[in-house]
Amino acid sequence: MKYGAIAGGEKSTVQTAFEILKNGGNAFDAAVGAVFTSMVSEFNLTGPGGGGAFLAGPVNADPILYDFFVDTPPSQPGKELDFFSILVDFGPSKQEFHIGQGSVAIPGNTAGLLTVHNRLGQLPLKAVLEPAMEAARSGVILNEAQAYLVKILEPILTHSKAGCDLFKPKGHLLNQGDRFQNPAFADLLEMLAAEGAGYFYEGEGAGLILKTIGQKGLMTRECLAQYRVIERQPLKSKFGGKTIYTNPAPSIGGTLITFALQLIEQSKSDEKPDLIKLLKVMEITSAARRETCHDIQNEQQIPRVLEPETLNHYLDLLNTDSTHIKNENDPPSRGATTHVSILDKQGNAASVTTTNGEGCGYMIQELGIMLNNMLGEEDLNPMGFHLWPRQQRLPTMMAPTIVTGQNGVELVLGSGGSNRLRSAILQVIM
């Protein structure tokens, strides 16, 4: 390959990665630049005010997982919050979402992406962010998928006047083929290139964030300034002679993918799993999640599903002809998430998943961004809203993954889709 291999969720996103690789950047430069461009071209799926996970596989070095998912703010029981539900119409069905100032968790995307660039990138940050600046100023043409998201998320995107100005610039909602421009976001990127993440978490940008959150939100200046990216050792397992690296706890997704692969790997059958067995593995994995990881606010509980005693219990279920698994669905969630995978010509691998939820409904006009609504996501708060026992990372299904063989990296992958992403990644690996 001349420059590398790239997979992303939108044409402009992928083009940014290509240009950065072409101009001498590595996979980490390209991934960081591509994600910032996706905040324009895939505005409804990700943003600086969301959270994510970046699995980096530097050539000739062990992979490392950069966890920059969102944190819960300090609990303030009894506080009056701007927190309310809306219905999003998907056509055949409607789904309830919770938004408002009280739905905003402490964002991690900006800190995380800039940390990865600082640790592993080789081009200047300004050069990495330039394509995203250009996309924001010149605009991107909305494709069918993004136009659909704008349509169904209209109640959230246009909840504030600033949102109306951005998505109804001529008085009507942007549609497929229209140009989406966000020059204020380009200005934010200029400030990040000049001042780094401090602008967003402690400087003038932080002031604008806190002003938007107001007194009916939970974020404070202190918790925003104290946000930290966590470098974790990836969850490592063997499957089919390959080595699988993925997102460890408090990610539920990476843990459950590893669990499912181990069920298949340790199954008594020597035959390649058929669709019936694969379905059974997925059902058992969902059951294990409910029975073993039921308190996802307890980070120590999540890895227990991989303990030998637990794994053997579910392996016995898999190896029987019939199963007594209670068939319950996972919490409903369509997911508003996107992913970028890159392998450069040197052999560096980058797998990064990011999200902004559905957005909290309030645009920060000066920055051109909408913060997340993670405190209003039912699948992230299964015990109820605003009930976390302490300030902590929220759990996530995100599972950026790298598969290696004897000759190095063989597969770089990940997915959006919330509860659906683990089954998608599992099937691709198999």
Report the location of each language-model feature.
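Generic beta-strand/beta-sheet core signal
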Residues: 33, 240, 247, 258, ...
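Active-site rim segments in enzyme catalytic domains, especially the processed small/beta chain
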Residues: 40-66, 217-220, 348-411, 419, ...
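A short, polar/proline- and glycine-enriched secondary-structure boundary/capping micro-motif
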Residues: 74-80, 255-259, 360-366, 420-426
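Glycine-rich phosphate/pyrophosphate-binding beta-alpha loops
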Residues: 245-254, 337-341, 351-363, 414-422
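Noncatalytic scaffold domains of N-terminal-nucleophile
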Residues: 1-19, 25-196, 200-242, 248, ...
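Extreme N-terminus nucleophile/cap motif
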Residues: 7, 16, 203, 260, ...
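M16/insulysin-pitrilysin zinc metalloprotease superfamily fold
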Residues: 254-269, 403-411, 417-430
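Internal maturation/activation junctions in enzymes
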Residues: 268-355
